[in-house]
Amino acid sequence: MFGQTTLGAGSVSSSASRVFRYEVVGLRQSSETDKNKYNIRNSGSVFITVPYSRMNEEYQRITRLGGKIVKIEQLVSAEA
């Protein structure tokens, strides 16, 4: 019994499979944003898909680039 847990693989994978989409406004065009794999749209809104495990890092990066997150929504897979 020592070292055993009651958590199964299903409970671990549920957080690993969660994906969220950030809607961001106010990103400045700079040498840092030029490194992105996407262009900043003319409307000013950018949609960034982020896995649950990286939400904090992505939030910090967006803030550092001068952006503001206006909406966060969870993306639901078609399998569910």
Curated annotation (Swiss-Prot):
SUPFAM superfamilies for this protein: Allophycocyanin linker chain (domain)
Principal subcellular localization: membrane
Matches recorded under PROSITE patterns: CPCD_LIKE
Subunit structure comment from the entry: Associated with the phycobilisome, a hemidiscoidal structure that is composed of two distinct substructures: a core complex and a number of rods radiating from the core.
One Pfam family cited in the UniProt record for this chain: CpcD
Name of the molecule in the record: Phycobilisome 8.9 kDa linker polypeptide, phycocyanin-associated, rod
Gene from which this protein is expressed: cpcD
Superkingdom of source: Bacteria
Family: Belongs to the phycobilisome linker protein family.
GO biological process: photosynthesis
Cell compartments where the protein resides: Cellular thylakoid membrane
Keyword Membrane tagged: yes
Membrane topology of this protein: Peripheral membrane protein
Source organism of the structure: Nostoc sp. (strain PCC 7120 / SAG 25.82 / UTEX 2576)
